[in-house]
């Protein structure tokens, strides 16, 4: 929006041309979303408290969590609002990737909002029934996959790239739709499973989102892409604005979500942010790198799958409680220790993911 205004104002002063620079708009995206989140956060928390929109706590979970009962939830709406406003202000709104990622984010956020609403407002412990949750996730995930497949301008946009073996490219054809569906929906649910402790999900999301922003910038630049042997995706660079907004909104939310949390993001935030990461990774053809950098999300998801499978097959549990962050709590780790150690793991994994740019 402001890019169009700057282009118009260039006829009066050439200084407005600076707004065209992607890096500047990425930084402005961070700052705008951060300021919005910090300014709107206190108002949203008060509103949630007044309306008694508070978190329910499982009785069979760690005893330390009982004090969290009633903490305002659905704070993910703050994150999504800051991301959307900042992106609409600073991104090139003629870019199809910007609209794709923004649409997927908000649509998955809508699924989470309905789930949270039923749990918190209607006091329905089931929330949105799983079959309907996965149905709408599938509808929106497949919709995004079909759109990206149908609008692909080069074979590289639907080719699977393997880090460290960049000379091997696997044309996916229609299988691209299937892979994209699983990446988006899987990433959405993985982040949601991770969102169980104060700040546990949002900081890894910010770090992975920032790293994906670097991939977007490099993939959108033909020279960088050719030099690094990564797919050149015209227009992908514009997603650095969205990634910047995600970073700013995430850090602003963390201000209130850090231990002890004043607000939780709820499904409205977790499902949306996970879907956003998955969609961006698909666009820049870095699904495998997302799997690496989002290792904490993968670990949380696998712990649930292993726990369920083990209990159904043997009647025994592998972990004291799943997702795995609760296992460590029940082992006696204080909540802040679990959180920070998972953050440290993410820092290492993100650095490994970025290192694949040069390793070949």
From Swiss-Prot:
This is Phospho-N-acetylmuramoyl-pentapeptide-transferase. GO terms for cellular component: plasma membrane. Pathway: Cell wall biogenesis; peptidoglycan biosynthesis. GO terms for biological process: cell division; cell wall organization; peptidoglycan biosynthetic process; regulation of cell shape. The keyword Zinc does not apply. It is a multi-pass membrane protein. GO terms for molecular function: metal ion binding; phospho-N-acetylmuramoyl-pentapeptide-transferase activity; UDP-N-acetylmuramoyl-L-alanyl-D-glutamyl-meso-2,6-diaminopimelyl-D-alanyl-D-alanine:undecaprenyl-phosphate transferase activity.
